[in-house]
């Protein structure tokens, strides 16, 4: 099952798991509606591929001007062959520690695979496999 990040966050809400306040943007006109988020706000491309941050698809906006600018830059962007058609705007969090966990299916071994890293998701997507426990 491939989920966009915002779909996963809707599951958080369903099961009362804390997560930052957010808003979906499907076109730039959506920015005319009240945002109702506290700055800084993270502008996140919604594509089903890793490396969004490195590709410029995740940016932190400190005010409405940056939010508009980053939304214009990211919406419609191509990230590894995936066109960005939806943005997730999310209140930035004060992150003390970051971890990465991924659940997937190893088809060659015919078993489930859980990957963990104490370095956060950027490590995993930066080819530092020696730091990932699976």
Give residue ranges: language-model regions.
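ATP-grasp fold ATP-binding core
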Residues: 5-12, 37-53, 81-95, 101
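Glycine-rich phosphate-binding loop of ATP-grasp-fold ATP-dependent ligases
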Residues: 20-22, 43-70, 100, 123-126
